[in-house]
Amino acid sequence: MNLIETLEQEEIARLGKIIPEFAPGDTVVVSVNVVEGARKRVQAYEGVVIAKRNRGLNSAFTVRKISSGEGVERTFQTYSPLIAAIEVKRRGDVRRAKLYYLRDRSGKSARIKEKLPARKIKTAAV
């Protein structure tokens, strides 16, 4: 590991942010700190993760939602101080790392199958 990677790892540890495990296809709620004049409030942004970029401190992810019938995408820096919290609502079962094809789809064709937790297999007693 080189010096820059070491410094980035130290900075991530110093930030102490709790980032849940999520992947493309998952539906997440990102709580964003919004400053309007002197007021500061938290705004929730819920949508499907269509891309994730893992680059240490420069990691980012893109969330897509449909707002008033129009597709809206927003890219968030994972370790940004503007992000208050990230909550995973549901796990999506997809076979791609980047879900850019969802941009061309709407309605039922844009649905993502839910990933169900693995069932425990009972072994026969011998």
UniProtKB/Swiss-Prot annotation:
The keyword Ribosomal protein applies. One of its GO terms (molecular function) is structural constituent of ribosome. GO terms for biological process: translation. InterPro entries: Ribosomal_bL19, Ribosomal_bL19_CS, Ribosomal_bL19_sf, Translation_prot_SH3-like_sf. Keywords: Ribonucleoprotein, Ribosomal protein. GO terms for cellular component: cytosolic large ribosomal subunit. This protein is located at the 30S-50S ribosomal subunit interface and may play a role in the structure and function of the aminoacyl-tRNA binding site. Belongs to the bacterial ribosomal protein bL19 family. This is Large ribosomal subunit protein bL19. It comes from Albidiferax ferrireducens (strain ATCC BAA-621 / DSM 15236 / T118). The gene is rplS.
